[in-house]
Amino acid sequence: MNANNSPEDDGSSLAPETKEPCPTKLPPSLRNELKARAASLAPPRTLEEVFSEALGAWAEEPEEPNTPPVKLTGSIPFTTMLPAGQWSLHKKVCSARGVTFAQGAARAVRRWLEDHPEAWTVRHPGKIRRIIVCNQKGGVGKTTVSQGMGQAAAEGAAYLDEVLTLLKRNSLKNKELIERIEQAEASELRVLLIDYDPQAHLTKQLGLEVLPAKGPSLAKAMLGHLEGSLADLVVPLTDARFGGRLHVLPACRDAFLLDAGLAGHRSRSHALETALKPLENDYDVMIIDAPPSLGLSMDAALHYGRRRDGESKGQSGCIIVVQAEDSSADAYDLLLEQIQDLMKDSGVPIELLGLVVNLYDASRGYIATSSLEGWQTMEEIRCVGVVPDLKEVREAVRLRIPLFTHDPVSLQAIELRTTWKEIS
């Protein structure tokens, strides 16, 4: 045994050309933080790469006496591929230091995170924007708009420059689109997308797993039944264009029962705010993909999106998504009535940040074109975006990846960047 509490080299060198599985467990929060930190590096690195590096560094360097253990409560299975022999070496180091294999892995990850601090932080501390994307009608594309604005808010400057370069190289060279990207600014904000809809469209469309009904969830946090931290459920999206800044709070099927639970809750209008408040200091923007509902859960979302004392106008509020057809107008009227009733009953200001017309197709004729004109000339709310009905969003949904990952130069992606700029 050497002075570093690591076993002597027994001649079994690691073989980087071959890989073997490493079965262990990590707390979800630690795994997610490692994944996000890896994606935020320049150039971005994979979870497999940084985990291997963390184990290697921990094996080579001694631990301080009385190093506190990492809490492994709620750990879940975690398997990745390591260079052949590295996991065996890790087990020897753990045995020498008197810790379990999982505890050793967690300590290695913790040390790596400490040695590789975040290169960016919340840009506007204390000024969290809370945006509720809503409509009582289902199928209008609230999820498309929610995740599109989130992607636009988190996108890195280098990737926006790349979009501009690609547009200029395009043989068509659409001057209007080029000008719009030239006028856009990469926000590079830290964003949390919250799937508040029990149908879990946002979660599934981004390739994430829906939370199990009997496990921890946002609904349980709202009802005061959550054991642990809501932060442990947050999942980072690892596409390098978002720099580790875009996170998702997945949906859970138990949200179908949320309205019934809120009916007997003493502070039901504050329930969502109470649940999400501990996360606010970690983000610049929270975007809530709301369900097609006029129930108590929607009341809680609208209350959360109100303008708080001291907040500037336009900082938080509602984005209403519609289509260029008559049934969307009926649903809009119902939602507007709910918002007005809530403001009257509670005395809180709820701002209408804008209207987004989604799935627009002028080829559908007079109904579509006249409806669009009606939306664009409304007095009580301004139209901040018109997203066309094109194949790229459907392709991204089928592939279960973000639209900006699938086709960052698509007209839909450009329109969603414009929408975000309009409300920024």
What are these regions (language model features)?
Residues 2-15, 20-22, 32, 36, ...:
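P-loop NTP-binding core
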